[in-house]
Amino acid sequence: MATKGGREKIKLESTAGTGHFYTTSKNKKTMPEKMLIKKFDPKARKHVDYKEMKLK
């Protein structure tokens, strides 16, 4: 059985202020810095930056 614990669930929250977010996971060992990704925000109806936040 494979070992667990390498990946952590995160929330990508829109910087446009609409409150929209995506959830995903990332490997903390290979990518320790915070993610900043351009994705589509359906509430703003355009591509905006999404910042990594902690998933509660």
UniProtKB/Swiss-Prot annotation:
Protein's UniProt keywords contain Transmembrane: no
Pfam families referenced in this protein's UniProt entry, alphabetically: Ribosomal_L33
A GO cellular component term found in this entry reads:
cytosolic large ribosomal subunit
Where on the tree of life does the source sit, at the highest rank? Bacteria
Name the residue ranges with Basic and acidic residues bias: 1-12
Query: GO biological process: any one?
Result: translation
Please list where the region (Disordered) is annotated: 1-28
Q: In the UniProt record, does the keyword Ribosomal protein occur?
A: yes
Its keywords, alphabetically, are:
Ribonucleoprotein, Ribosomal protein
Regions of biased composition (Polar residues) lie at: 15-25
Instruction: Give the Gene3D superfamilies listed for this entry.
Output: Ribosomal protein L33 (2.20.28.120)
UniProt GO molecular function: structural constituent of ribosome
Record-linked NCBIfam families: PRK00595.1 (NF001860), rpmG_bact (TIGR01023)
Q: Which family does it belong to?
A: Belongs to the bacterial ribosomal protein bL33 family.
Protein name per its UniProtKB record: Large ribosomal subunit protein bL33
Natural source organism: Albidiferax ferrireducens (strain ATCC BAA-621 / DSM 15236 / T118)
Source organism phylogeny = Bacteria, Pseudomonadati, Pseudomonadota, Betaproteobacteria, Burkholderiales
